[in-house]
C-alpha cells in the first residue's frame, strides 16, 4: 500500500470535530425528548387521545434509534482516535529506524570519506556553482552526482561523477553560452551505465560557435555507454558538434549514441560518433548522431561506433546528414557505419547514414562499415542513401567490405543516389558502389551497386558498380551493377562486379566464380568477369 498516505494530525482534528458534532446532537435530542415523548391530547375524545399516543410513540422510537446512533458515533470517534494514534506510532518507529540507518551509514562511511574522499555507500552530490563537477558515488554502491549546468557564458558544464562498484555515472551539466557540456561520469566498475554528456551551450554572438556536447561516460564491465550531449545552437554562426557516445562494458552492453549536432544559421554542427561496443561475446556499437540543420550548410552525421564481440558483433549506424534549408544551401553527408569484428561467429558493419536534403545539393550517403570475422560470416554494412535536392541529389554511399578467413564474406550493397525534384535542371545522385566480399576459403560475394537517383525532368544518376567477390580458395560472386536513375536525359547502368578480390592494390581473380550482371541504362553496364577455371561472366545490362 505504498500509494496510501496518512496525516495523523489531520485524523486527530477530524476525530475532535466528529465528537463535537455528536455532543451537539445529543444536547438537541435531550432538549426535545421531554416535549415530544409526552404529548398532551387536544381533547377528551378517543381520536385526540389516539393522535397524542401516536406522536408520543414515534418520539419514543426516535429516542431509541438516536441512542443506537450515538453509540455508533462514539465508536466511530474512538476508531478515528485509535487510527491516528497508530499512524503516529508507526511514523515515530519509522523515524527511529531511519535515524538508525542514517547513523549506521555515517559510521560506515566516515572512515572511507576520510581516506578516499568518498563514502562506501551513497550517491555522490550534485555539482554546484562553487564546485561544478558531480561527486563520485559510494565505493561499493551509489550513483555519481550530476554536473552543474552553467549560467555564465563561456564556462563549461560540470562533469558527472563516477559510480563505485555498482551504480550509474552522473550526467554532465549543460555548458554556458557557447561553452561545452560536461562529460558524463563512468558507470560502476562491476555494473552500471555511463552518464549522458551535457548539452553544449547556445550562442547568439555573430560568427560564434555553439558549444560542443559533452561525451557520454563509459561503462567499465557490464552496462550501456552514456549518450553524447547535443551540440549548442548558433543563431549567427556554426552549430556545436555533438558529443561522442561512451563505450559499452567490456563484458556486455551497448555503446552510447552520439549527440546531435547543433543547428545554426551558417553551418550545422557535426553529429557525435557512436560509442564502441566492446562486449566479450556480444558487441553492439552505438549509432552516430545526426548532423545539425542550417540555412546554409547542414552538418555531417557522426560515425557509428565500432564493435568487437568475440562471437557476435554489429557496428553502429552512421548518423544522418543535416538539412540545408535556404535557397542555394548544401546538405550534410551521412556518417560512416561502424566497423565490426569477431573471432568466431558473425560480424556486420553498420549502415551508412542518409545524406541530408539540400536546396542546392543533397548530402552523400555514408559509407557502410566493414564486417570481418576469422571463422564464420562477415557482412559489410549498407551504404547510406544519397540525400534529395532541388538541384543535384547526393551520391549513395559505398557498401562496406565483408571478409572472413573461413566462411562467407559478403559485401554490403551500395546506397541509392538521391532524387532531384527541380524541373528541367535536376540531376540525380550517383548510386553507391557495392562492397567487396572476400573469403580465403568459402564464398566471397560482392554487394550490389546502388541505383542512380531519379529526377522529374533532367539527368538521372548513373548506377553504382557491383562489388567484387572471391578469394584464393573460395567461390567468387560479383555483385550486380545498379540501374540508372529515371530521368528525361540518359544515364548509365553500373558495371557488374568481378569474381575475385583486390589485394594490395591489385586484382586477384578467383579460380571459380561468377561475374555480376550489368545494370540497366542508356548504356547498360558491363558484366563482371567470372572465374579463370570455372564459372561465367555476368551479362551486360540492357541499353
From Swiss-Prot:
InterPro entries in the record: PE-PGRS_N (IPR000084), PGRS_rpt (IPR048996)
Pfam families: PE, PGRS
Domain PE: 1-93
Cross-referenced SUPFAM superfamilies: PE/PPE dimer-like
Taxonomic superkingdom: Bacteria
Stretches for region Disordered: 194-214
Family statement drawn from the similarity comment of this UniProt entry: Belongs to the mycobacterial PE family. PGRS subfamily.
Designated name of the protein: Uncharacterized PE-PGRS family protein PE_PGRS44
Organism: Mycobacterium tuberculosis (strain CDC 1551 / Oshkosh)
Amino acid at each position: 500500500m505504498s500509494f496510501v498516505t496518512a496525516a495523523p494530525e489531520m485524523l486527530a482534528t477530524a476525530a475532535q470535530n466528529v465528537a463535537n458534532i455528536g455532543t451537539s446532537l445529543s444536547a438537541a435530542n435531550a432538549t426535545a425528548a421531554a416535549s415530544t415523548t409526552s404529548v398532551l391530547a387536544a381533547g377528551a375524545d378517543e381520536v385526540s387521545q389516539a393522535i397524542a399516543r401516536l406522536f408520543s410513540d414515534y418520539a419514543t422510537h426516535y429516542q431509541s434509534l438516536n441512542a443506537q446512533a450515538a453509540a455508533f458515533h462514539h465508536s466511530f470517534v474512538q476508531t478515528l482516535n485509535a487510527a491516528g494514534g497508530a499512524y503516529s506510532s508507526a511514523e515515530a518507529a519509522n523515524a527511529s529506524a531511519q535515524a538508525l540507518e542514517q547513523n549506521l551509514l555515517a559510521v560506515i562511511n566516515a572512515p572511507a570519506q576520510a581516506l578516499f574522499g568518498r563514502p562506501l555507500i551513497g550517491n555522490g552530490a550534485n555539482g554546484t556553482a562553487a564546485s561544478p563537477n558531480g561527486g563520485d558515488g559510494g565505493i561499493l554502491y551509489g550513483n555519481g552526482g550530476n554536473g552543474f549546468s552553467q549560467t555564465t557564458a563561456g564556462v563549461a558544464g560540470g562533469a558527472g561523477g563516477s559510480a563505485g562498484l555498482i551504480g550509474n555515472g552522473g550526467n554532465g551539466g549543460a555548458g554556458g553560452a557557447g561553452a561545452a557540456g560536461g562529460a558524463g561520469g563512468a558507470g560502476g566498475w562491476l555494473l552500471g551505465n555511463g552518464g549522458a554528456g551535457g548539452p553544449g551551450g547556445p550562442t547568439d554572438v555573430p560568427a560564434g560557435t555553439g558549444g560542443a556536447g559533452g561525451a557520454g561516460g563509459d561503462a567499465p564491465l557490464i552496462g550501456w555507454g552514456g549518450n553524447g550531449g547535443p551540440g549548442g545552437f548558433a543563431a549567427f554562426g556554426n552549430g556545436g558538434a555533438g558529443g561522442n557516445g561512451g563505450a559499452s562494458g567490456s563484458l556486455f552492453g551497448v555503446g552510447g549514441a552520439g549527440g546531435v549536432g547543433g543547428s545554426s544559421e551558417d553551418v550545422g554542427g557535426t553529429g557525435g560518433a557512436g560509442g564502441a561496443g566492446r562486449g566479450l561475446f556480444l558487441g553492439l556499437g552505438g549509432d552516430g548522431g545526426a548532423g545539425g540543420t542550417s540555412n546554409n550548410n547542414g552538418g555531417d552525421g557522426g560515425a557509428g561506433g565500432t564493435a568487437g564481440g568475440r562471437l557476435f558483433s554489429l557496428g553502429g549506424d552512421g548518423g544522418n546528414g543535416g538539412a540545408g534549408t535556404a535557397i542555394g544551401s548544401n546538405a550534410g553527408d551521412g556518417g560512416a557505419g561502424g566497423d565490426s569484428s569477431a573471432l568466431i561467429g558473425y560480424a556486420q558493419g553498420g549502415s551508412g547514414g542518409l545524406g541530408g536534403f539540400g536546396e542546392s545539393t543533397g548530402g552523400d550517403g555514408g559509407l557502410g562499415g566493414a564486417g570481418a570475422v576469422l571463422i564464420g560470416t562477415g557482412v559489410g554494412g549498407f551504404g547510406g542513401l544519397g540525400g534529395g535536392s532541388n538541384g543535384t541529389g547526393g551520391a549513395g554511399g559505398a557498401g562496406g567490405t565483408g571478409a572472413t578467413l573461413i566462411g562467407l564474406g559478403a559485401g554490403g550493397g551500395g546506397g541509392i543516389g538521391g532524387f532531384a525534384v527541380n524541373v528541367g535542371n535536376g540531376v540525380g545522385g550517383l548510386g553507391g558502389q557495392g562492397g567487396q566480399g572476400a573469403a580465403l576459403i568459402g564464398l566471397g560475394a560482392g554487394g550490389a551497386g546502388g541505383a542512380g537517383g531519379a529526377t522529374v525532368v533532367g539527368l538521372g544518376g548513373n548506377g553504382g558498380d557491383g562489388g567484387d567477390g572471391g578469394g584464393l580458395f573460395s567461390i567468387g560472386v560479383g555483385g550486380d551493377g545498379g540501374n540508372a536513375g529515371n530521368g528525361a536525359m540518359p544515364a548509365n547502368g553500373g558495371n557488374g562486379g568481378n569474381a575475385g578480390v583486390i589485394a594490395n592494390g591489385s586484382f586477384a581473380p578467383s579460380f571459380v566464380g561468377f561475374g555480376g550482371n550489368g545494370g540497366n541504362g542508356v548504356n547498360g553496364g558491363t558484366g563482371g568477369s567470372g572465374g579463370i577455371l570455372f564459372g561465367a561472366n555476368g551479362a551486360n545490362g540492357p541499353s
